């Protein structure tokens, strides 16, 4: 079975979060008896850890991904689960995100003849959803049984314009804030009898909206406070509002913590009557550019694609953050990501074959 045939097989599973649609049974059969399998299934989510010990070296490289895809939606030009190749292009749900990566590392790992240590594959059926019972639960189990990998490659689509142009060496965290400025409702004709929370907050908005909370560094852009919602009043012109609500998000680097954001907001709102709540949806992580897995991936991309790749930490969150939280040196590399989650999501045969060759080279030379 070629990697493209494997890719097509995976695409035909209607594995919408958190349903694997039988894909994991197929994968276990595909890998064969040489690969051991650990299962952690919780709350309708399936997690699989396949591993093969080549020798007693403690080095452990894990490839990671998710089998689940987002819902299809309407307006597709082709059947999103037919996985047909037309002029070198495969249009299907999950083509970029991320069954291309899954196929590439499954093929590369199955066909690896030698490796200095242990090769493993971690996959979940819930990355596109909440992920509460996904990758993190498998990693918790692996820690309990002392099988945490040293290094991880998450095959998410990372490239931006040209295949091979970017690897993720980290991800920003996500901090959400909810502010309520309190006032006193009244008639617009008698502003002296009202406490208008909009007026009281107006001079503060420029001090927090779009402000960089740090200066960034060689890995991360500055952590910026982004206002996502402001609302007050009853959509009438003669009543002042009783309260003003503001929501914001900060995609934070390792240079800014939730406590930093909390202190920044409280300092700026001093003197106002307000409520403030802050939550951390995910934590940032970064893998040092001198890490073995970073250097090895750079070399493999150059060997196969003749491209000097760049390091990136841009974009949203991914399951790579869980590897970082467990002290695993993790990076991400996959195909171009220009149609992820969209109607007519697609990738090319050339990219999938190239990704497979990069992974094969990485395994061979790691």
Curated annotation (Swiss-Prot):
State the needed cofactors, names only.
Zn(2+); Co(2+)
Reaction catalysed by this enzyme: N-succinyl-(2S,6S)-2,6-diaminopimelate + H2O = (2S,6S)-2,6-diaminopimelate + succinate
List the SUPFAM superfamilies hit by this protein, alphabetically: Bacterial exopeptidase dimerisation domain, Zn-dependent exopeptidases
Which residues make up the binding site for Zn(2+) 2? 97, 128, 341
- State which pathway it belongs to: Amino-acid biosynthesis; L-lysine biosynthesis via DAP pathway; LL-2,6-diaminopimelate from (S)-tetrahydrodipicolinate (succinylase route): step 3/3
* Residues given in the record as Zn(2+) 1 binding sites: 66, 97, 156
The UniProt note on the cofactor reads as follows: Binds 2 Zn(2+) or Co(2+) ions per subunit.
Keywords in alphabetical order: Amino-acid biosynthesis, Cobalt, Diaminopimelate biosynthesis, Hydrolase, Lysine biosynthesis, Metal-binding, Zinc
Where does the record place the catalytic residues?
A: 68, 127 (proton acceptor)
Cross-referenced InterPro entries: ArgE/DapE_CS, Bact_exopeptidase_dim_dom, DapE_proteobac, Peptidase_M20, Peptidase_M20_dimer, Peptidase_M20A
Which PROSITE patterns does the annotation name?
A: ARGE_DAPE_CPG2_2
Which Pfam families does its entry note?
M20_dimer, Peptidase_M20
What Enzyme Commission number(s) appear in the record? 3.5.1.18
Which GO-annotated molecular functions does the record name? acetylornithine deacetylase activity; metal ion binding; succinyl-diaminopimelate desuccinylase activity
Q: Which GO terms describe its biological process?
A: diaminopimelate biosynthetic process; L-arginine biosynthetic process; lysine biosynthetic process via diaminopimelate
Q: Which domain of life is it from?
A: Bacteria
> What is the role of this chain?
Catalyzes the hydrolysis of N-succinyl-L,L-diaminopimelic acid (SDAP), forming succinate and LL-2,6-diaminopimelate (DAP), an intermediate involved in the bacterial biosynthesis of lysine and meso-diaminopimelic acid, an essential component of bacterial cell walls.
Q: Per its UniProt record, what PANTHER family does this chain match?
A: ACETYLORNITHINE DEACETYLASE, N-ACETYL-L-CITRULLINE DEACETYLASE
Q: Which family does the UniProt entry place this protein in?
A: Belongs to the peptidase M20A family. DapE subfamily.
* Assembly: Homodimer.
Q: What is this protein called?
A: Succinyl-diaminopimelate desuccinylase
